[in-house]
Amino acid sequence: MNPSEVASAGIHPIELCVHSILSSNLEGIYQAITELRESQALLVMKFNQVKKSFMDEQELLQEEGSLKEELARVNQLKKRLDKLTELYAELARKCGAL
């Protein structure tokens, strides 16, 4: 607006300056808020990816824990099988001697 239009509209030049300064600041604030929302959305997406990765790793660790239990059980069964094999060999030897 040129000075004659401002005067005819009944707007004081200082009011126009204040409005201009406040408007540009408000637009900057609005833009900053928009950028913050976008970065917040990206951070939430990254957080969800990290959370999913963490949960997957936790599941793997729990599976490894259950595998350790199963391996211990297999080892116990192997020991029992070895003892039974020895007993069978001894019985076969005794039966062969008869």
From Swiss-Prot:
Its main location: other. The keyword Transport applies. It is found in: Endosome. GO terms for biological process: endosome organization; regulation of protein localization. Residues 55-98 form a coiled coil. Keywords: Coiled coil, Endosome, Transport. One of its GO terms (cellular component) is endosome. Component of the biogenesis of lysosome-related organelles complex-1 (BLOC-1). Component of the biogenesis of lysosome-related organelles complex-1 (BLOC-1), a complex involved in endosomal cargo sorting. This is Biogenesis of lysosome-related organelles complex 1 subunit SNN1. The lineage of its organism: Eukaryota, Fungi, Dikarya, Ascomycota, Saccharomycotina. The gene is SNN1.
